[in-house]
Amino acid sequence: MKSTIFFLFLFCAFTTSYLPSAIADFVLDNEGNPLENGGTYYILSDITAFGGIRAAPTGNERCPLTVVQSRNELDKGIGTIISSPYRIRFIAEGHPLSLKFDSFAVIMLCVGIPTEWSVVEDLPEGPAVKIGENKDAMDGWFRLERVSDDEFNNYKLVFCPQQAEDDKCGDIGISIDHDDGTRRLVVSKNKPLVVQFQKLDKESLAKKNHGLSRSE
């Protein structure tokens, strides 16, 4: 009996530690469906004046290593794979996440670069979101938080350094390059970037790309 009680105590303690993740609200796409763990989505602006999230070269970069918001409102950006290390089907608010661009979307621009997002320190624009290998990349993870209670399913991206308290996490916002207007994603104390998610239909996209290649 004592061993059974001890086992139940350990079981309750373990499951309780994961309770906030279990009861957290699911993150919803723009059709009201929960985001799938490991699914691919366009990350879109909540306003129509700007486009989606993609990679672009900035400064002296030869490859598209900087994560930016497109200034073209018709550009949905690059599909982004959103994954949690938890063995769960759907993404919920507050879950630790890794984000990476679909490799096929950038392979034509610069072969072989890692496409996982990271936050890089010691840049003029502040801690900025980048892809590729970088020695100044911070250890940490992203998470999603809802910013409105309406039907539009608006969220903000948050970056949390590894082993940091919640008050050390920072919202992902926009830093505008005054020379060329590039809208870089950065960790910001100002207004966060508010986004929505649109599921990427890979099968339809593959058919479209196949049709384009045959017509060229």
Swiss-Prot record:
Site, Reactive bond for trypsin: residue positions: 87-88
Could you confirm whether the keyword ATP-binding appears in this record?
Answer: no
Which residues does UniProt assign to the signal peptide? 1-24
Presence of keyword Ion transport: no
| Cystine residue pairs | 63-110, 160-169
Q: Known InterPro entries for this protein?
A: Kunitz_inhibitor_STI-like_sf (IPR011065), Prot_inh_Kunz-lg (IPR002160)
Which superkingdom does the taxonomy of this entry point to?
Answer: Eukaryota
Q: Which residues form the propeptide?
A: 206-216
> What are the UniProt keywords, alphabetically?
Disulfide bond, Protease inhibitor, Serine protease inhibitor, Signal
Q: Which Pfam families match?
A: Kunitz_legume (PF00197)
Q: Which GO terms describe its molecular function?
A: serine-type endopeptidase inhibitor activity
Matching SUPFAM superfamilies: STI-like (SSF50386)
Instruction: Summarize the protein's role.
Output: Inhibition of trypsin.
Instruction: State the similarity comment.
Output: Belongs to the protease inhibitor I3 (leguminous Kunitz-type inhibitor) family.
Miscellaneous information on this protein: The sequence of variant A is shown. Electrophoresis identifies three genetically distinct variants, A, B, and C, that are inherited as codominant alleles.
In its UniProt entry, what is this protein called?
Trypsin inhibitor A
Q: Which organism is it from?
A: Glycine max (Soybean)
Taxonomic classification, please? Answer: Eukaryota, Viridiplantae, Streptophyta, Embryophyta, Tracheophyta
Designated gene of the protein: KTI3
